[in-house]
């Protein structure tokens, strides 16, 4: 039997690329899924999805409302900027911290049993060889993602601290160059792999990899 069968599961960031896939997978496994809409509509429509509208996770009251009465939370929400803006966009980092802090506090207060965070590989140091997970904290984050990478590291320490103080089971997935259906393929704002796919399908000739 699926761990998620008949469980109430919240997916934050359910209108985003990765959140969309989590919702579909959880529905397929028999979960009762709840998500929220802040600015962007959902990419999939299914009557089995409970949708709360106008939820702003930078506000603790909204986070409390979203996770009330649920068993598990899959946290995919975040403020995303174009890669070129990450080193300098102070507001992106601040909002990310506000969101994770509010969601974790809400989960603790509402008695959520399990919490999965979709984090990022931007916290890893710069290496000229295939890096391992154990090297995450060995050096400073890569300079192009320096402040953003430290924010991502802070998230993990915050979750580690929370797991020590509560009974909540917390897992972290460090996403690396994720791509696929429902991704952003706008060449002005997308990441490297979606851009390469879009350019390849458009018949670019010669095809130049940056």
Regions found by a protein language model. Give the residues of each.
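SDR active-site strand-loop-helix element
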Residues: 12, 36, 73-77, 115-121, ...
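Conserved glycine-rich Rossmann-like NAD(P)H-binding loop of the short-chain dehydrogenase/reductase
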Residues: 31-39
